[in-house]
Amino acid sequence: MEKKSLFQRIRQSLKLDDEMDEAQIRKAAGLIRNIFRYMDKDAKDIMTHRKNIVAIDATETLEDAFQFMLGESYSRFPIYEEDIDQIIGFIHLREAATCYLDESLRKRPVKELDTYIRSVSFIPETKSIDKLFKEMQAKKNHI
């Protein structure tokens, strides 16, 4: 497989050619601006501050947690024990819905759904975004 430069990948993904319309040119320019804007940033510059994290207490029942999740605009939810600094993993809304279909699981605490709880990576605040994105891509990690 041929390795392509970043520019070549952008060009291919946006299908850049001589017949680009104005909207495509704006989209390409915005993408390139965003790449350069974040190249010299660290993880702390894009992390969600702990007071803004929408998370689920591990002792909540699946029923309560699922209702909470449906009221939010996220698809992945960290799960914590005792306080927000004790993240034990995260659950995807789609997997919570699968569990919810099984009525026998609805009254169980979320922490007991261990086959559906995914592990989280702990990222140093000083890690460069460039390195972080490469690691996340390699691991196919979206959170």
What are these regions (language model features)?
Residues 3-143:
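Soluble cytosolic regulatory domains appended to membrane proteins
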